[in-house]
Amino acid sequence: MADLEAVLADVSYLMAMEKSRSQPAARASKRIVLPDPSVRSIMQKFLEKSGDMKFDKIFNQKLGFLLLKDYAENVSESPCPQIKFYEAIKEYEKMETPDERLTKAREIYDHHIMVEMLAHAHNYSKESLQHVQYHLLKQNVPPDLFHRYVLEICDQLRGDIFQRFLESDKFTRFCQWKNLELNMQLTMNDFSVHRIIGRGGFGEVYGCRKADTGKMYAMKCLDKKRIKMKQGETLALNERIMLSLVSTGQDCPFIVCMTYAFQSPDKLCFILDLMNGGDLHYHLSQHGVFTEQEMIFYASEVILGLEHMHNRFVVYRDLKPANILLDENGHVRVSDLGLACDYSKKKPHASVGTHGYMAPEVLAKGVAYDSSADWFSLGCMLYKLLKGHSPFRQHKSKDKNEIDKMTLTQDIELPNEGLSKDCRDLLEGLLKRDVPDRLGCRGKGPTEVKEHPFFKDVDWQTVYLRRMTPPLIPPRGEVNAADAFDIGNFDDDEVKGVKLQDGDSDLYKNFNIVISERWQNEIAETIFEVVNQDADKAESKKRSKQKIKVAVEEKDSDVIVHGYIKKLGGPFTSAWQTKYGKLYPSRLELYPESLTAKPELVFMDQIEDVCAEMQTIKGETAIIVKLRDGFKEPKICLTNSDEISLKEWHTSLRTAHKVSQELLQRMGRKAIKIYGVNHDPMLSESERPGSVTRAFLNRASSVDSGV
């Protein structure tokens, strides 16, 4: 029965992989629904405050670029050829060979430069034109040939085109997507978990599928009780920090990166790139030792992975074949950053890693080190790929102390036969015991390793684009991992007496994260167009039913903020009711959700206070608006599942109330100076609420632009 279950788990996993590979969106079992377009009001303020309303911030986000492109090509009344020009250049920059680049460069010149020159519409500098012409004449086509044009294209786009985009519905759609991203709270329900594919000291790794996009990932689940039992909290949090460091910004195809991290009451979960091809240790045992030509491939991709880490001041500290994972096409990524360390502010001293791969300075007590440790480990790993064992396990010794002693004291004697001169020189350079003499530590970092004669035939751009041919391609249609029975299970009795306290939860309060760039790429590759089409239909249908229109409130009135918000109301004020709120300097208007009736009005002088701290009311974080005596309710409670909107409403309400109070106090003092008493003689007794302030607000509200 166990064998049958294992087979069924493998079949289910492989089917999910195949469908995710061809049509990931078709595998989505959960639909994304974008927030209402009114969220633009909130998001525009939020983006302005965070400095993210600038052209570069939006243009360099995947979804921002796609929506700006959509506006330029399908909405803008004036032609916008810059986008296609930009995309052609980006395609050129990814070309592998000089011949490919030359063909593409000539195509770009003919279709985007010459055509505009003939039409006297080439609005770019003479220097950019001459630079391209000169290099094309020489048939010299470096990847950055059109870099000057890219800068000028961006300068043109950030002008009138970008300003018109910000006033369009496409920017509203960007606000909707960004709001969705920033409010994401993942749980286990957002993933379909498949078979186990690995196990570590604190937990297991599973194959999984993201429910709303159909994309396959690896889910690394760490058990909080097991972490507590082994006092591994620092290690778990460090892995989360290191993964976010290497996963943010420019993507690295040679590191197993993280897209999400979230937690359940008993688990810490990392959502990582899924690698289906097994690890180099496994393939070394199956394939046997590699030739130098085969080893060059793995060395080149691993070097680019290390370069990515070192550029972010991260030292990996655990480089070995078992941590180098293959994808289904045979390309590799460095995995498991549990021992990685940020050395930007303080260099580490700890002796951590795997015996036989640790550098002498790591083994030496109290010695500070940095990226130097990884270059030594690289030498050890490459030696093992060529010879089948670590250079410090000549006699297959398993005595850790003996291995460490050899690492600290023994000069490596490379065999005379079986190694080329360049390969021997590379390994000797990487395995130097003295850090200043070691290759990679002489002042130029990864560059001096890449420039070593052993890699003289390597085109590093080709390596980066993953177009170098792998020496080994894992078998398709197989799960390249041990079966669940062999991987085994943890003994639950080990953690039976471990109790999680409130203080344990506090340790992980900042654990959750969404890596923006990677989430946006996932959306763009899967469901972006489908969700946009569904949202367009739903919004059009909703607008047709609304009797009260709220179009472009920001421009047509002095509304401070508007959008959907929930108010505690109903019988016995026991239920949260959805309202459409509009905040003006003098009042708060709360419309029914359908926008089919007049609003409930709350004037600023009726408000005693907007509490500085939000409170938990009926399980929701709520804004508390205290009202003055005589009002039918002692307070108004407002909430929103959208955390950004809730904070912006809270800030705006407090600010509006404070400003109105200051204004009313000034008006009161003026009345005393003019009339000698604190009242307005223009009001009758029936109109006077007790001070001049209400009269002022009533008159002010009559001139506010309403609905």
Curated annotation (Swiss-Prot):
Listed result of changing Y109I: No effect on ability to restore locomotion or avoidance to the aversive compounds octanol and quinine in animals lacking endogenous grk-2
Keywords (A to Z) from UniProt: ATP-binding, Chemotaxis, Kinase, Nucleotide-binding, Phosphoprotein, Serine/threonine-protein kinase, Transferase
Lineage: superkingdom: Eukaryota
Domain RGS: from-to ranges: 54-175
Site feature Required for receptor phosphorylation, where: D3, L4, D10
N-terminal: region residues: 1-190
Result of altering D3K: Failure to restore locomotion or avoidance to the aversive compounds octanol and quinine in animals lacking endogenous grk-2
EC number annotated for this UniProt entry: 2.7.11.16
Reported effect, R587Q: Failure to restore locomotion in animals lacking endogenous grk-2. Reduced ability to restore avoidance to the aversive compounds octanol and quinine in animals lacking endogenous grk-2
Mutagenesis or variant effect for R106A: No effect on ability to restore locomotion or avoidance to the aversive compounds octanol and quinine in animals lacking endogenous grk-2
Residue ranges occupied by any Protein kinase domain in the UniProt entry: 191-455
Domain PH intervals: 558-658
Tissues where the protein occurs: Expressed in many neurons in the adult including the ASH neurons and other sensory neurons, many interneurons, and motor neurons of the ventral nerve cord. Expressed broadly in head neurons and is detected in several head acetylcholine neurons including the AVA, AVB, AVD and AVE premotor interneurons, the SMD and RMD head motor neurons, and the AIN, AIY, SIA, SIB and SAA interneurons. Expressed in HSN motor neurons and VC4/VC5 motor neurons. Also expressed in vulval muscle cells. Expressed in premotor and RIS interneurons.
GO molecular function annotation: ATP binding; G protein-coupled receptor binding; G protein-coupled receptor kinase activity
SUPFAM superfamilies: PH domain-like (SSF50729), Protein kinase-like (PK-like) (SSF56112), Regulator of G-protein signaling, RGS (SSF48097)
SMART domains: PH, RGS, S_TK_X, S_TKc
Active site: D318
Matches recorded under CDD domains: PH_GRK2_subgroup, RGS_GRK2_GRK3, STKc_beta_ARK
Quaternary structure and interacting proteins, as annotated: Interacts with amx-2; the interaction promotes phosphorylation of amx-2.
Role noted for this protein: Specifically phosphorylates the activated forms of G protein-coupled receptors. Required in adult sensory neurons for chemotaxis. Plays a role in the ASH sensory neurons in the chemotaxis response to NaCl where it is likely to modulate the strength of the NaCl avoidance response which occurs at high NaCl concentrations. Required in the HSN motor neurons for normal egg laying by promoting phosphorylation of amine oxidase amx-2 which inhibits amx-2 activity, preventing metabolism of serotonin. Acts in head acetylcholine neurons to positively regulate locomotion.
Family: Belongs to the protein kinase superfamily. AGC Ser/Thr protein kinase family. GPRK subfamily.
Record remark on domains: The kinase domain is required for chemotaxis activity.
Protein name stated in the entry: G protein-coupled receptor kinase 2
Species of the source: Caenorhabditis elegans
Gene expressing this chain: grk-2
